[in-house]
Amino acid sequence: MADDNNSNGATNPTLSILAQYTKDLSFENPGAPRSLQARDKAPTININVNVNANPLSDTDFDVVLSLNAEAKDGDKTVFHTELVYGGVFRVAGFPQEHMLPVLFIECPRMLFPFARQIIADVTRNGGFPPLMIDPIDFTQMFAQRVAEEQARAKVQAVPN
């Protein structure tokens, strides 16, 4: 039987997914059926990603991955899709300084393949080739978020 304690008596860190869910999904194809006709060049696709986490208890957290993709041909929207995909995670035994990286890097990394598949399916079902979103560097996203928050804190700390 596996021992849940290491040699100094501390609990080994555990991260598990208790549930995954689609909170919100929308797909707009405002130019249909004209937008489905062959075109000379591929539309420009802009993808925005956001991650949020909220505590549900001392060990359970709701982590939400938001993906927003818009395809444009010039100034005309070809399609627009939004997905808010969440997971309830049990996070236990991690040192406090590791909690934010676990919630904002590891949890969305686990959710991403499922969210990516939903976006691919909905764009395909909308009459377009499946939109296969490239892997996301959640470590870089988290580092950028921390840097932005530190910069905001510095600006607020400067007296007028």
Curated annotation (Swiss-Prot):
Pfam families: SecB. Coiled coil: none annotated. Keywords: Chaperone, Cytoplasm, Protein transport, Translocation, Transport. One of its GO terms (biological process) is protein transport. The keyword Signal does not apply. It is found in: Cytoplasm. One of its GO terms (molecular function) is unfolded protein binding. The keyword Cytoplasm applies. InterPro entries: SecB, SecB-like_sf. GO terms for cellular component: cytoplasm. Homotetramer, a dimer of dimers. One homotetramer interacts with 1 SecA dimer. One of the proteins required for the normal export of preproteins out of the cell cytoplasm. It is a molecular chaperone that binds to a subset of precursor proteins, maintaining them in a translocation-competent state. It also specifically binds to its receptor SecA. Belongs to the SecB family. This is Protein-export protein SecB. The gene is secB.
